[in-house]
Amino acid sequence: MAVTKLDVQYLRKMTGAGVMDCRNALREAEGNYDKAVEVIRKKGKVIASKRESREASEGCVLASSKQGFASIVAVKCETDFVAKGEDFVDMVRKILSVTLENKPRTIEDLNDLFIDGRRICEWITERSGISGEKMELGIYEYLEAPYTVAYVHPGNKLAVIVGFNQVIVKTQVARDVAMQIAAMNPISVDKNSIPAKIVEREEKIAREKAIEQGKPEAILDRIVNGALNKYYKEYTLLLQNFVKDPKITIDDYLKGQSRDLTVIEFRRINLNME
């Protein structure tokens, strides 16, 4: 049977496949849309499997929050051209929406949830076959708190989610903190939450440096403590100078809004550093 332009357009809307792929699938399926969709899916899986060994070094990362739950999703692909395409970004948005509605605990749990009647891992594989590039769900992070905020830096390569200890936080204040994390890349909320191994490493580095410089043993501990305090100020969120007002720290900024307001936890994902 003859395949019309309208038939091809309809199938493209259903699958996102290219014009020739849709035309050939309709011919193979003798005009049956459901069969044509299956033809495209099977072809997509074959193409995707051939690309498994390729490196997916580009991608798109998005974040959002809803009613005390915030999540970050990153889907990886091979080229920046695909990563910036509206179809690819929309795919990540759909996955992100699923996380807000279902609150999965692991990336494996997320892969097993459904979009358009298919498991997300299978859905991505089909999209991979259609696009001709390897695609994979690369990162999933979430947090829960009385108040949450999400921030996505322009370009969709860097995203942050933050949880606060109070239910009511001014939108601009929450956004300021999220943007601070994006810009300054702290490794923890405060010094008490820095892993012990990192503290030990910094102590060792500071002590060895002081000894190499011939500093008296009597003041080594003081030098080490000074180096640690400098490290804490640079890499812990609450002790960092506020980017928008360097005369105060983030802790000062939060306390200026509400005496007990603080950050419980945060996540920061930068695809360029993964």
UniProtKB/Swiss-Prot annotation:
Keywords: Cytoplasm, Elongation factor, Protein biosynthesis. InterPro entries: EF-Ts_dimer_sf, Transl_elong_EFTs/EF1B, Transl_elong_EFTs/EF1B_dimer, Transl_elong_Ts_CS, UBA-like_sf. It is found in: Cytoplasm. GO terms for cellular component: cytoplasm. Residues 79-82 are annotated as: Involved in Mg(2+) ion dislocation from EF-Tu. Pfam families: EF_TS (PF00889). One of its GO terms (molecular function) is translation elongation factor activity. SUPFAM superfamilies: Elongation factor Ts (EF-Ts), dimerisation domain (SSF54713), UBA-like (SSF46934). Belongs to the EF-Ts family. Associates with the EF-Tu.GDP complex and induces the exchange of GDP to GTP. It remains bound to the aminoacyl-tRNA.EF-Tu.GTP complex up to the GTP hydrolysis stage on the ribosome. This is Elongation factor Ts. It comes from Azobacteroides pseudotrichonymphae genomovar. CFP2. The lineage of its organism: Bacteria, Pseudomonadati, Bacteroidota, Bacteroidia, Bacteroidales.
